[in-house]
Amino acid sequence: MKVRASVKKLCRNCKIVKREGVVRVLCSDPKHKQRQG
C-alpha cells in the first residue's frame, strides 16, 4: 500500500474508489494499491 498526496491509475485494471472520505486505488496487481494521505 503506497500512501501518496495524489493517487493515479497505474494500469487499466486500476480502479479509483472513495471510501469514507479516503481516495483509494484498487487493482489486480497488489503493487498498485494506493491511498491518499
From Swiss-Prot:
Q: Which InterPro entries has this protein been placed in?
A: Ribosomal_bL36, Ribosomal_bL36_sp
CC annotations in GO: cytoplasm; ribonucleoprotein complex; ribosome
Record-annotated disulphide pairs = none
In this entry, which stretches build a coiled coil? none
Indicate whether Ribonucleoprotein appears among the record's keywords: yes
- The species this protein was found in: Pasteurella multocida (strain Pm70)
Keyword Transmembrane among UniProt keywords? no
Q: Name one GO molecular function term.
A: structural constituent of ribosome
Family membership: Belongs to the bacterial ribosomal protein bL36 family.
Question: Which Pfam family is one of this chain's hits?
Answer: Ribosomal_L36
Keyword annotations for this protein?
A: Ribonucleoprotein, Ribosomal protein
Record protein name field:
Large ribosomal subunit protein bL36
Which residues, if any, are the signal sequence? Answer: none
Share an example GO biological-process annotation for this protein.
translation
